[in-house]
Amino acid sequence: MPLCIPQVLLALFLSVLIAQGEGSRRRATQAHSTTQPALLRLSDHLLANYKKGVRPVRDWRKPTLVSIDVIMYAILNVDEKNQVLTTYIWYRQFWTDEFLQWTPEDFDNVTKLSIPTDSIWVPDILINEFVDVGKSPSIPYVYVHHQGEVQNYKPLQLVTACSLDIYNFPFDVQNCSLTFTSWLHTIQDINISLWRTPEEVRSDKSIFINQGEWELLGVFTKFQEFSIETSNSYAEMKFYVVIRRRPLFYAVSLLLPSIFLMVVDIVGFCLPPDSGERVSFKITLLLGYSVFLIIVSDTLPATAIGTPLIGVYFVVCMALLVISLAETIFIVQLVHKQDLQRPVPDWLRHLVLDRIAWLLCLGEQPMAHRPPATFQANKTDDCSAMGNHCSHVGSPQDLEKTSRSRDSPLPPPREASLAVRGLLQELSSIRHSLEKRDEMREVARDWLRVGYVLDRLLFRIYLLAVLAYSITLVTLWSIWHYS
């Protein structure tokens, strides 16, 4: 019995020492917990045993829903030749991480925390149309809410492929798609949804820089599933960026100069058709238009799969100028007939000076209907004229009597008759020359009348062709611009 009392006292003493040690450790722990910041304690609590290589769900059968959102900020470049669109967007991702949840009361009522992106699991959402790495700023943090919702906000410069249709340039509207999808996970693992409503996404232009060449019409969305293999389906969200080019600059620098040159070409028809200045004027105008096309060639978009309609317009305008020059050369050659040119045929005279002149309301064209002067008629007239003159001269005997009565030296009668005949032949030749000159002048006047009527006809046909072509293009461009 005396031996048991010391043992009991020793046991009590040891118990007191152990209790004091545990209390000291508890107080030290509480003091340390009170001095450590809540954010640091929360970060250590969340990332202590976190495995970022595992999809953050407690039930592996449950897919991770990733909600995405896109806000268009700027259209940086549209490369028609390489079919590349460069944009700048604000991209937002939302998903639930079941391993990043806590009770706010345990951590000084902290409801959200920013942690490094490299420390947690992030869905592998990529854009299928990527063709180059843009100069996007790096955002190394994400926001985590106490329910486990992760918010990943980052600006992106996207260099994506786009099928650009430049046929309607400069009144073209482009529709480029941005397809967001998981590169590895099927729809059973990662599903994609839209964070906002499609109407809100389509009409959101709150941060868009609207001072450039392109105008944002809207961003349309579409969700779909696609499968590479029959057993694997993938979720993807498409954003269709619809933009329209502002055509004012191109209308002023491309269309107006071409229109002015065509108007000057039409006004050039007011020059007289028998003037050689019209040909030189048309050639100068054609050379000026060629220089204009060389200058604007770098402004037009170039692709290997198509040509814009405005390029066809320039080619047709060049062809019209060439046709106008050819018509001018034809008319000038027609009204400048040479001396040996045949008279206007009767069928051409009737067709042009009667029918076409009446059709064009040019009034009645005077025509010279004169019978052709034949060599036989001229010969008869010459002989009769010579005969009459010879009858007045008389016979050689009369000439001899007259010479004797006057007592003056005269040439022999035969020589006098030959001189008179030579003089009459010279007069007849002069008369034939004058008649021939008048006939050639009349032929030239006839060809001038024909050329004038044909010039008016070709001018009106040319004017109708230019107006019809211009009205067609203006109508098409107006429909494309306001559709």
Swiss-Prot record:
GO terms for biological process: behavioral response to ethanol; cellular response to growth factor stimulus; chemical synaptic transmission; inorganic cation transmembrane transport; monoatomic ion transmembrane transport; regulation of membrane potential; response to cocaine; response to ethanol. Residues 419-455 are annotated as: HA-stretch. It is a multi-pass membrane protein. It comes from the Eukaryota. Induction: By nerve growth factor in PC12 cells. Disulfide bonds join C162-C176. Residues 274-278, 327-460 are cytoplasmic. The keyword Transferase does not apply. Residues 24-246, 298-307, 481-483 are extracellular. It is found in: Postsynaptic cell membrane; Cell membrane. Keywords: Cell membrane, Disulfide bond, Glycoprotein, Ion channel, Ion transport, Ligand-gated ion channel, Membrane, Postsynaptic cell membrane, Receptor, Signal, Synapse, Transmembrane, Transmembrane helix, Transport. Glycans are attached at N109, N175, N191. Forms serotonin (5-hydroxytryptamine/5-HT3)-activated cation-selective channel complexes, which when activated cause fast, depolarizing responses in neurons. This is 5-hydroxytryptamine receptor 3A. It comes from Rattus norvegicus (Rat).
